[in-house]
C-alpha cells in the first residue's frame, strides 16, 4: 500500500520513546527509528513534521538537498531536520494538526 500510494508512515510510540518512519523499499517495508522523549502527537505535510513530546514540540523541516546525499543515492526523496523546538512544560499532546501555517494540538493533561 505504501508503495502504491508513494507515501511513508510516521508512528509514535511514547512507551518506547521512538518515532518510527516506515517506507516501501521494493516489496518490503524499511523502518527508521529516532529517539524522542515520550513522543505522542504527530502532524505532517510535505514540508514539515511536528512531534509532540513530554515537555516540548519539535518541528522538523524537509531539506531535499540533504535527502539527495543520503546513501544509497536515489532512495530518499525527503529528509526532515530539526528546525524549531517549543517548550510546553509537562503536558500530554495526543492530537496535532496544521491549520495553514499554525500548529494546533490537544492537551489531555490538566
Identify the residue ranges that each predicted region occupies.
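Sequence-structural signature of mature extracellular/luminal beta-sheet repeat domains
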Residues: 1-110
